[in-house]
């Protein structure tokens, strides 16, 4: 009686992880192949790449405080909860990361507030 594919699959499914690892190594040696995953070519369409790179978390980076540092310090304190000295140091030590890992909506709202106060902000 011949061994079928189903018999082979049933045998393999009953192996332990260690036994399966040894079996894979023997396949690699016997047939001169590698069990490394195959690299898939990237998508050609720009829209598909943009959708794949859509970020969900952003860092709010203060690039420049502008001329109205006092207003920017007030907004930084309100957004971050920092004390006066810490907020002043963050504003004067640009570029500085004000918040990390925030949602897109929160990041855009903070950027708008800071820009209205006279600062230059980047979302990364």
From Swiss-Prot:
Homodimer. Part of the ribosomal stalk of the 50S ribosomal subunit. Forms a multimeric L10(L12)X complex, where L10 forms an elongated spine to which 2 to 4 L12 dimers bind in a sequential fashion. Binds GTP-bound translation factors. PANTHER family: 39S RIBOSOMAL PROTEIN L12, LARGE RIBOSOMAL SUBUNIT PROTEIN BL12M. The keyword Ribosomal protein applies. InterPro entries: Ribosomal_bL12 (IPR000206), Ribosomal_bL12_C (IPR013823), Ribosomal_bL12_C/ClpS-like (IPR014719), Ribosomal_bL12_oligo (IPR008932), Ribosomal_bL12_oligo_N_sf (IPR036235). HAMAP family: Ribosomal_bL12 (MF_00368). Belongs to the bacterial ribosomal protein bL12 family. This is Large ribosomal subunit protein bL12. Forms part of the ribosomal stalk which helps the ribosome interact with GTP-bound translation factors. Is thus essential for accurate translation. SUPFAM superfamilies: ClpS-like (SSF54736), Ribosomal protein L7/12, oligomerisation (N-terminal) domain (SSF48300). One of its GO terms (biological process) is translation. One of its GO terms (cellular component) is cytosolic large ribosomal subunit. GO terms for molecular function: mRNA binding; structural constituent of ribosome. It comes from Campylobacter fetus subsp. fetus (strain 82-40).
């Amino acid at each position: 009686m011949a061994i079928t594919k189903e018999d082979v699959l049933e045998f393999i499914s009953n192996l332990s992880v260690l036994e399966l690892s040894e079996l894979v190594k023997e396949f690699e040696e016997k047939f001169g192949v590698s069990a490394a995953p195959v690299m898939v070519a990237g998508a050609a369409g720009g829209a598909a790449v943009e959708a794949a790179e859509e970020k969900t978390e952003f860092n709010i980076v203060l690039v420049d405080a502008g001329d109205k540092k006092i207003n920017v310090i007030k907004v930084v304190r309100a957004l971050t909860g920092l004390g006066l000295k810490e907020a002043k140091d963050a504003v004067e030590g640009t570029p500085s990361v004000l918040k990390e890992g925030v949602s897109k909506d929160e990041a855009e709202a903070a950027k708008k507030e800071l820009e209205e106060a006279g600062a230059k902000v980047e979302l990364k």
